[in-house]
């Protein structure tokens, strides 16, 4: 933890990135070219990577507008070495295939800030059921659970949620 504090100014970040030192160690041998941060979030890892090597360039990708706006401010001192891309990471490699990519970082999952912000609809304490990583997407979780058929919900829970009792869960949702 002490080493972590020395390498990262905690006051600058609303979220502490996981495995920070380990991630920096993985990328320390990259001296030129681009690193893609597929899930930039609040730029904890990105900031560390840019500080660690003054010649590496970064492509910062995220689908969350709020996270990207924060990251742009946070990485302002590195603006000549950073490109921002709004979108899901699924097409990022194709979009930047002509760049000299030397490394890829993907911190997959929901950020604790998304969970903590009640208006995002990820928390059990939220008043609305939203759960959109990209707030510009039209389809939210409330629409899914309130308008999809029992068969459609069963398929979602079985295929994506890997829920054993998927039929029971879908039935309870449709009944209520």
Task: For the regions a language model picked out, list residue spans one by one.
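S-adenosyl-L-methionine-dependent methyltransferase catalytic core, i.e., the SAM/SAH-binding region
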Residues: 1-176
């Amino acid at each position: 933890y002490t080493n972590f504090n020395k390498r990262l100014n905690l006051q600058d970040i609303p979220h502490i990135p996981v495995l920070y030192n380990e991630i920096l160690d993985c990328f320390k041998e990259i001296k030129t070219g681009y690193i893609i941060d597929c899930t930039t979030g609040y730029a904890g890892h990105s900031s560390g990577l840019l500080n660690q090597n003054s010649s590496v360039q970064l492509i910062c990708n995220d689908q969350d507008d709020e996270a990207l706006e924060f990251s742009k401010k946070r990485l302002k001192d590195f603006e000549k070495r950073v490109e921002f891309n709004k979108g899901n990471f699924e097409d990022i490699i194709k979009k930047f295939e002509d760049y000299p990519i030397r490394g890829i970082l993907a911190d997959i999952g929901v950020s604790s800030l998304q969970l903590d912000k009640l208006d995002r609809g990820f928390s059990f304490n939220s008043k609305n059921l939203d759960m959109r990583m990209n707030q510009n997407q039209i389809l939210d979780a409330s629409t899914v659970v309130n308008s999809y058929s029992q068969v459609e919900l069963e398929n979602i829970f079985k295929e994506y949620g890997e829920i054993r009792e998927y039929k029971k869960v879908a039935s309870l949702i449709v009944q209520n």
